[in-house]
Structures are given as structure tokens and as C-alpha cells.
């Protein structure tokens, strides 16, 4: 087990980790395959309800006894919540059935788009202040007459008509986007993850709005639980706590999956830029992270930017040089030994080498050329010195000869003058 301080660092091993020990790419693929299976099962149920309308839970054709239909309604609502955005879009686009009539044969209005409910406005006894007694069949005649009086004789039953066609369309699009996500995670194409990611963002926002709406209308929802024909005693505080706990757990799970898909998108983008070593860490199965890793989900929310390739905490795909080993034989020579070496013992390095493999040959050729040039320069200097010496000796000889001739010529003139 790794220590807790090691999990707080920006190590690349824990940077893209989810579900305690899985890589974000593996978790995204598993999540996408699970969503595909759930959506295929849901589409199968929708096709069955399309060809067999008796399976539709809300279509009770005016029957006010909601004991059996409400059970199926809440079961299907739970299944709707497993598929992103299906339940929310379906609730906003469905209308009551045009031919639906109530018990007295009065036709329902199309403007009502709320769930099946009856307005029971009766006083709760003092003994049931914290308990809500829901018993429709065993109501006293006075309460029934009082309820009918408040309904002003309309006896209008608001029934929501289920439309499987809208749900099939929404689920098909969600299934296609989920297939894109799995394909993008497998083939390392990050742009294929964005459509399903946007659906997840939309579903998370709608789920949060539903939770806030439930918190503001808890007292109205207590009267909607009609799962049995007999009386049901429900604690209002306990019922509110259970519903809020389940809703918060679903919201946290959706937020976790949303962050996992986003981390997979960032990982694929970095992998495309070439800033990661490899896809699957070889030692990711060699340890199990602590509970802190579950809370942080391997996400790095620090101040450093992940997209910056110059960060020292990021892994790199460039080939790493071999570590330099200390060898006394290859160490630098002493200063006295350097002074004993002649100045032209080594040729200067070449200015440019286009061929990396031929650096040694080019250096040797340059050294030979330089030595040859130095020899030629020395020979030219010797020749020049010899020529200079010869010329100087010739000039001195000619000067001596001219002096002798001058002396010979001046001798007769001196003799003539003496005479």
C-alpha cells in the first residue's frame, strides 16, 4: 500500500487513475460498455411497449386505482435515470392521451402535463402529525364529499401519457454517442469523447435541478406514494432523508463519471502531443490505492498546467540519455600535461557535419588536410628563407664588386693628379 503523502504528489502514476486502481482510459471503456448494455436493454423495453401498449404504466385509461400502475411507474422512472437525459427530455415533451377519459366519462384536457394525482384536501388528525395516512379506498363519506366539493364537480383526473417514440429517439442518440466514446477511447481519438461528455454535463445539471425542486416540494410528494391498496404510514423526515440520500448518491456518481471521461479526454490529448511515456502503466496492478485516492479520483487540480510540456512533473516520450558514469581514465588531464602538448598537435573541430555517422572520418580527413597544410607552409617558409638568404648574399657580392671597381677607377685619376 502506498503512503498517503505519495498520493498527494503530482506523480504521473496517480494523475490518471480512477476507481482505486484503474487507468482513466480503462475506466472510460468499461463505463461506455456498461452504458451501451443498459441502453440496449432499455431500447428493447421501449420497442416492446411500442408494439404492446398494455405495458405502458401510465396509460390506465381513466382508472383511478393507481396501486399497480404506480409501482411500474416508479420502476420505469428508476430505469430512466440510468440512461442520461432520457427521463428529463421525456418528461418535458410528453402529453396526455387525447382519448383518455376519467371515471365519469369527461374528456381530459391536453393542457395538463403533470403526473396522475387526485387533490385530497382533508385535514390530518393530530395523532398523525408526523405520519401521513394514505388510504383512498377506506376514506369516510364526509371526506369524499368534501373532496368532490373542492374539485367543483369536474372530477378531472390528470393522467400523463407515455410516449415511447420520443424515448426511443433520445436513447438512440445517446447510444450512438456512447459508441463514439468507446471508439474514441480505444483508438485514441479524444474528439469522439466530447458528444457523450456534453450529454453528461446536461444530465448532471438537470439532475441537480430535480434535487433542488424536490427539496422545495417535499410535502407534496409524500401524497404521491400509492404502492398498496391498504394504508401506508410514512415518516416524513425519514422519507425526505432517504430520497435526498439516493439523489445525492446518484448525483455524486454522475459527477464522478463526468470527471473520469474528462480526465480520459485530457490523457488522450497529452498522448497525441507526445508527452506521456506509455498508455498502460506496468505497475498499476501492483498496488491498491487508499481511500484518499477514491476521493480525489486521481485528478490533479493543482496550479500547474497539464498541457504545458515544459513542466518538470510531466513524463516525456523523448529518448532519455544513458547515465554518465565516472571513469578516472576518461577524466580531464592535468594542467602540466596540457602545457607539454604542442600547439598544432590536434586539428580544430569541423565547422559543420551533415552526416552524424561520419564525424570521425571527417575529423581525421580535416586533421590530415591541416597537417599537410602546415607542412606545406613550413616548406614555403624554408624556401622563402633560402631565397632571401641567397638574394642577400648576391646583393652583398655585387656591392663589394662595385666598391672594388670604384676603387680601381679612382686610382688612375689620383695618379694623374699627382703628376
Curated annotation (Swiss-Prot):
Location relative to the cell: Cell membrane
Keyword list, A-Z: Cell membrane, Membrane, Phosphoprotein, Receptor, Transmembrane, Transmembrane helix
One Gene Ontology CC term in the entry: plasma membrane
Mode of membrane association: Multi-pass membrane protein
Record topological domains on the Extracellular side: 50-165, 215-240
Biotechnology: Potential vaccine candidate molecule. Induces an immune response in mice and confers protection against S.mansoni infection.
All ranges on the Cytoplasmic side of the membrane: 1-28, 187-193, 262-419
Main location: membrane
Top-level taxonomic group: Eukaryota
Entry PTM: Phosphorylated on tyrosine residues.
InterPro entries: LAPTM_transporter
Residue numbers spanned by region Disordered: 303-328
Function noted in UniProt: Cell surface receptor that binds to human complement C2a protein. This results in inhibition of the classical and lectin pathways of complement activation, probably due to interference with binding of C2a to C4b and interference with cleavage by C1 or MASP2 such that C3 convertase cannot be formed. This infers resistance to complement-mediated cell lysis, allowing parasite survival and infection.
Protein name: Tetraspanning orphan receptor
Species assigned in the record: Schistosoma mansoni (Blood fluke)
Amino acid at each position: 500500500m502506498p503512503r498517503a503523502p505519495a498520493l498527494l504528489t503530482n506523480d504521473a502514476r496517480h494523475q490518471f487513475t480512477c476507481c482505486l486502481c484503474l487507468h482513466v482510459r480503462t475506466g472510460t471503456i468499461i463505463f461506455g460498455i456498461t452504458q451501451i448494455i443498459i441502453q440496449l436493454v432499455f431500447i428493447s423495453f421501449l420497442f416492446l411497449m411500442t408494439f404492446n401498449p398494455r405495458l405502458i404504466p401510465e396509460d390506465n385509461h381513466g382508472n383511478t386505482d393507481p396501486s399497480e400502475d404506480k409501482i411500474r411507474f416508479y420502476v420505469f422512472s428508476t430505469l430512466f435515470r440510468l440512461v442520461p437525459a432520457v427521463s428529463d427530455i421525456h418528461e418535458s415533451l410528453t402529453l396526455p392521451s387525447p382519448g383518455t377519459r376519467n371515471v365519469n366519462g369527461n374528456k381530459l384536457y391536453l393542457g395538463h402535463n403533470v403526473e396522475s394525482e387526485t387533490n385530497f384536501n382533508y385535514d390530518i388528525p393530530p395523532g398523525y402529525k408526523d405520519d401521513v395516512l394514505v388510504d383512498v379506498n377506506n376514506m369516510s363519506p364526509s371526506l369524499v364529499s368534501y373532496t368532490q366539493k373542492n374539485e367543483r364537480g369536474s372530477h378531472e383526473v390528470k393522467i400523463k401519457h407515455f410516449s415511447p417514440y420520443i424515448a426511443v429517439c433520445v436513447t438512440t442518440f445517446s447510444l450512438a454517442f456512447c459508441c463514439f466514446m468507446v471508439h474514441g477511447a480505444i483508438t485514441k481519438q479524444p474528439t469522439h469523447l466530447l458528444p457523450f461528455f456534453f450529454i453528461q454535463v446536461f444530465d448532471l445539471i438537470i439532475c441537480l435541478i430535480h434535487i433542488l425542486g424536490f427539496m422545495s416540494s417535499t410535502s407534496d410528494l409524500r401524497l404521491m406514494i400509492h404502492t398498496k391498496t391498504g394504508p401506508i404510514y410514512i415518516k416524513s423526515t425519514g422519507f425526505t432523508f432517504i430520497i435526498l440520500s439516493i439523489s445525492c448518491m446518484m448525483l455524486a456518481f454522475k459527477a464522478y463519471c463526468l470527471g473520469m471521461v474528462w480526465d480520459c479526454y485530457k490523457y488522450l490529448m497529452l498522448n497525441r502531443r507526445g508527452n506521456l511515456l506509455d498508455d498502460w502503466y506496468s505497475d498499476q496492478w501492483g498496488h491498491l490505492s487508499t481511500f484518499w485516492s477514491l476521493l480525489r479520483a486521481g485528478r490533479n487540480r493543482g496550479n500547474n498546467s497539464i498541457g504545458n510540456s515544459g513542466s518538470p512533473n510531466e513524463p516525456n516520450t523523448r529518448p532519455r540519455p544513458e547515465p554518465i558514469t565516472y571513469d578516472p581514465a576518461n577524466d580531464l588531464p592535468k594542467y602540466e600535461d596540457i602545457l607539454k602538448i604542442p600547439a598544432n598537435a590536434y586539428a580544430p573541430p569541423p565547422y559543420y557535419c551533415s552526416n552524424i555517422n561520419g564525424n570521425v572520418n571527417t575529423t581525421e580527413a580535416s586533421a590530415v588536410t591541416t597537417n599537410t597544410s602546415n607542412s606545406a607552409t613550413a616548406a614555403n617558409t624554408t624556401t622563402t628563407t633560402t631565397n632571401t638568404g641567397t638574394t642577400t648574399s648576391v646583393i652583398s657580392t655585387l656591392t663589394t664588386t662595385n666598391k672594388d671597381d670604384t676603387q680601381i677607377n679612382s686610382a688612375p685619376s689620383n695618379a694623374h693628379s699627382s703628376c
